[in-house]
Amino acid sequence: YCQGNGNMIPTTVDEVLEVLFKVISGLILASCLLRAGYGKPVGSAGAILGVSIGSVISLLYMIIYKRRHYSELSAPYTAGIHAPNDTPDDDELVDSAWKIVKDILSIGIPIAFGACIMAILNSVDSKLCMNRLQSAAGFSYYQAKVLYGVYGKAQTLFNLPAAFITPLTIAIVPEISGAIAKGANAAARKTSEDAMRISAVISLPMGVGLTVLAYPIMNVLYPNSNAAGPGLLAIMGAASFFVCTVLMENAILQASGHEKLTMVTMISGGLVKIIVNWFLVAQRSINIYGAPVGTLVSYVVMALMNYIFICVALRHRPKLFGIFARPLAASVLMGAAAWAIYGLCARFIG
């Protein structure tokens, strides 16, 4: 509701409170339970309980904030009552609660379904990789577990750029949908292109940095990890840009009322990932490197599908050169400079 009103401050405070109380309460509960002699399983349960406590605190904050700042808007917004500032000549009435619920479900279910499908496909993919490493590539269970473990470490860093883009996608949805509702299609198109440009400015340098500096990053964060780590991170660094692009494109499609199309792209991308991994991971010479390649290919496919949907459904073709040219050029120069400086430092400093 606050985001729909263009107010992101409550969301920021809410997220900070949730994380803060989750960590503090979880640590306190785990420590108290362990000192009381309940053992590690119960202590772990106490730490997990901190997640619920953080969620409850954040919910209470939003309820209090809503009552303090938006309570004056609640009373008039009931079925059959004119909205504030309406004149007697206005025929438009506020939608009923049932219609609002139906609209929310019709929009939310495809979005939630697409997210669930991707999570399910990722779970299937993890099982598939372990199985193909053993049954087809000929690795032992321990070797396959080590390879998939280092892939999981690279995934942690791979998810970092998307963490910066997700809040932006939340912010642009009401901006674009509001412009479309007012009939300001030109403003909606400009906002869409600006959002994609901001996404590129953030994700391209981060992706290039992860790719170029994969070796030192993995060695610093995971010094005793498997040697495959830097190569995996380098591939996933390239994929991270397409992940951010897909997130922004999904937000644009959802804001314009085409949320079902995002579900199609998510399912298609997940299936592509499974197919690519099925063949590549089975090759002993490729093994676990096939997993990040599958991720890269799947998100490239999703980005292209979303772009086509935006062009067809919205009758608008974003100017890709104007959006990506300068961020890409700057990122390449940055990557070259970072690689050269790291090489010099490693050579003379060690």
PLM-predicted stretches and their roles:
Residues 5, 9, 20-59, 260, ...:
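Membrane-interface helix-loop junctions in multi-pass transport and translocation proteins
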Residues 11, 15, 48-51, 55, ...:
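Residue-level signature of transmembrane alpha-helical cores of multipass secondary-active transporters
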Residues 110, 143-165, 196-198:
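Alpha-helical transmembrane segments of polytopic membrane transporters and translocases
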Residues 145, 193, 210-243:
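Interfacial segments at transmembrane-helix termini and the short loops linking adjacent helices
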Residues 162-184, 196:
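Helix-loop junctions and terminal segments of transmembrane helices
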